[in-house]
């Protein structure tokens, strides 16, 4: 969090310590069902321990035109490639919808549940997912590129970025 705050001025920050999240399933459940209660702005930047802002000058207000933006998953079919949640920007509206009774829960990671399992439901509610062309400037995870992105996700990228 300190690495992100060093480069960017947020409208507020919340560091949540309770309840203890000790599994992938518990993390997904918290993000999908509880996170919206802690958001006091129109958007939330999700930053897991293995990702953060690397190019603050790469920020674009274009990112705020979408309810969900995260790194491209190149192994998914076109139209479903935007999805990594480890460093992602989400609207409060999206976070409220993931806690609704109509959202279908599974044991998949929360980002898969949002971007694949419930995508049609969310889009029918007016949720907009960023297109690949925009997401590539927001963050990267597995996709190698020369684009200077706003942030990244994945400890496997630390060496590549010279962060060791």
Predicted feature locations:
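Active-site-proximal specificity loops/subdomain of glycosyltransferases
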Residues: 1-42
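Alpha-helical elements of Rossmann-like donor-binding domains used by nucleotide-donor carbohydrate transfer enzymes
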Residues: 3, 30-34, 58, 68, ...
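A short acidic, often aromatic-flanked loop/helix-cap motif at beta-alpha or helix-coil junctions
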Residues: 18-27, 76-77, 135-139
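Short, solvent-exposed loop/turn segments at secondary-structure junctions
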Residues: 19-21, 50-53, 74-76, 93-95, ...
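Short, conserved loop/helix-junction motifs that constitute active-site signature segments
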Residues: 38-40, 60-64, 90
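Short beta-strand-to-loop acidic/aromatic patch adjacent to the donor-nucleotide binding site
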Residues: 41-54
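Conserved donor-nucleotide/metal-binding helix-loop-beta segment in metal-dependent transferases, i.e.
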Residues: 51-82
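Catalytic core and acceptor-binding pocket of nucleotide-sugar-dependent glycosyltransferases
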Residues: 80-164
């Amino acid at each position: 969090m300190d690495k992100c705050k060093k480069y960017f001025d947020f409208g507020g920050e919340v560091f949540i310590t309770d309840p203890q999240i000790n599994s992938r399933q518990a993390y997904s459940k918290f993000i999908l069902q509880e996170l919206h209660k802690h958001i006091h702005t129109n958007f939330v930047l999700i930053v897991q321990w293995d990702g953060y802002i690397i190019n603050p000058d790469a920020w674009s207000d274009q990112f705020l035109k979408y309810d969900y933006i995260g790194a491209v998953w190149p192994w998914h079919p076109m139209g479903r490639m935007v999805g990594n949640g480890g460093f992602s920007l989400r609207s409060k509206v999206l976070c409220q919808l993931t806690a609704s009774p109509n959202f279908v829960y599974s044991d998949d990671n929360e980002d898969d549940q949002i971007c694949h399992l419930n995508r049609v439901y969310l889009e029918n509610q007016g949720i907009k997912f960023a297109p690949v062309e925009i997401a590539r400037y927001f963050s990267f995870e597995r996709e190698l590129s020369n684009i200077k992105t706003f942030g990244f996700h994945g400890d496997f990228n630390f060496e590549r970025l010279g962060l060791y």
